[in-house]
Structure formats: structure tokens, C-alpha cells
Amino acid sequence: LIHNWENLKDDLILFLGAGASVGSINESGYSLPNAYELRNQIWSRFILHPSERDAYDFSNLSLMSLEHASTLAEIKSSRRNLELFLAEKFQIQKSLWQHGMLPFLNTKSIFTTNYDNLIEKGFHTVNYGKPLNSIFNNTTSLNSRFIPLYKPHGTIDYPHSKVSEGGFVITQFDYYEIMDTRQKMLESFISDFQNKCVIFIGYSLLDFDIASILYNMARKNKTQCWYAVFPRNDSDVRNMLRDK
């Protein structure tokens, strides 16, 4: 990427996953949780009796997904309590230094599945280049004066909004509700991929509907290199993705 920078710098698209938020601290002084940590915290808070929490073995949950645990939590408690809990977990005061560098990349657009507003705070801190325009559904009009920030899973800035208007997409039913909207948003986002360099930062590609669209786009788009940065950058992962 560094050696090819002069050829790519004017055609960048960023795709940020949970790994891009590693190192961030919330207002309670704790690291932002990853998916499995958040699942365990939701299970402890809403499902377990207080007397069970200290000794509970979360391996009992096996491969239970975050959205499944969240669905049960919403049923047992309430949607608002779940939203308040998530807001507390992802409320931050400042972004990391690397988020403050994002505006200087002059990216064409940004896509993130993260709830936090580290990207927004990074742009606000340095006040450089085009401002962001957050997009939560496929009805928002694009404006060349702004950098589109696609956030299909919602944001900490609108914790109590509808899921298609910035609210948290966290339960199984939330995902069902936005399935069509997210598909159209993805199509809008990837329509700009042709001849662009896509950089994935901390994105695991475990979301199969997103990953499948990206995979097919990558096979068609042979004119630019795509790059991926992962917290766990081992040789097996690198070799698996290199030719895909």
C-alpha cells in the first residue's frame, strides 16, 4: 500500500470493522467490547440472576450469537433498557489518534458496522477536508460536498431511534427489519467501487451477506488492489485472503 500510494491516494474507500476501534475506552473507563464480549455482558446483565454473575462460565453459551442473546434480553427486560445498556458501553469522550488521521486520506466514502462515533469525533477534532454525512438507509441523498459515512447497524448518536434511522441493529428481528434496506445501501455503496482502492481496517468479513457482495465485486474489479488490516494479522489469514 505504501509503495503504491501515489497511484491510489485519490481513489480510496474505507471499510471499518470492530478492529478499527481496538484501544478505545468508554466513559466508564472500560475498553469497547467486541461481539462476544458484548454478548457475555448482555447475558450477565439481563439473563443471569445477580447471584450467578461472578461464577458463571460463559463457555456455556458456546457459539450463541450476539443478536440471539440480545433478542432474549429484549424479551426479558425491554427494548429501552437494552438501548441504554448499549449506549453506556459505547459512549466515548474522544477518538483515537488514528481516527483523527482519517480526514487526511481524502477518502471517497466510508462504511462501518460499528456503533461508536470514533470516526465522527476524529473528523470533528481535526476539522479538515469535507465533513461527513451519516447514512443509515437507502433513502438519503448523496451530496458531493460531504463524505458519505454508511452506518447500517446504527450509531451511539441515536440510541432510541428506529433501526432504519440510526437506532441500534442488535437483535435478530432488527436484522430481519433492515435486510432489504441494508442490501440497497450496500448496492449504493459498492456502486462506487469500480476502479477504487478499498482498504478494510479491522473488518473480519464474518457478515456473510456483506462479505459475499464484496467478494463478487472484488472478482469483477481487477483494476485496483484492495488491502486489509487486521489486529490478528497471521500468515494463514493473509494467505487465505490474498487471492480472493
Each language-model region and where it sits:
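Conserved catalytic-core helix/loop/strand module for nucleotide-ribose chemistry
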Residues: L1-C197, I201-K244
